[in-house]
């Protein structure tokens, strides 16, 4: 399996298929905000590919160099409870060129149009 950035179309697919299913609407950023943040270079929506299939996601909000917030960790519903989430975290660790800080919090998302 390989952790890499998706195409924009793949991002839209996993947002609708995985993130909307796994997270309450109040905890889910609007897709347009994720796309805008990614285009501006301070958000990385990594996906774990098993061949051509995306089986999980780790979306990172980049901050000070060497630091990132794990914004979403999600595994496709058909692949849950099989170690995919742990594999995603391990592959992030293996990237080695950044230190990651994981912060879990609940918040109300404000649209940043």
Regions found by a protein language model. Give the residues of each.
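Structured beta->alpha junctions
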Residues: 7, 74-77
């Amino acid at each position: 399996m390989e952790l890499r950035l998706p195409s924009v179309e793949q991002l839209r697919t996993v947002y609708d298929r995985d993130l909307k299913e796994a997270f309450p609407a109040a905890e889910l950023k609007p897709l347009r905000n994720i796309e805008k943040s990614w285009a501006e270079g301070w958000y990385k929506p990594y996906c774990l590919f098993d061949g051509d299939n995306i089986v999980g996601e780790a979306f990172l909000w980049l901050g000070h160099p060497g630091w990132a917030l794990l914004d979403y960790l999600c595994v496709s519903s058909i692949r849950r409870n099989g170690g995919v989430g742990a594999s995603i975290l391990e592959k992030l660790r293996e990237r080695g060129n950044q230190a990651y800080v994981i912060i879990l919090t609940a918040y109300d998302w404000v649209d940043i149009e």
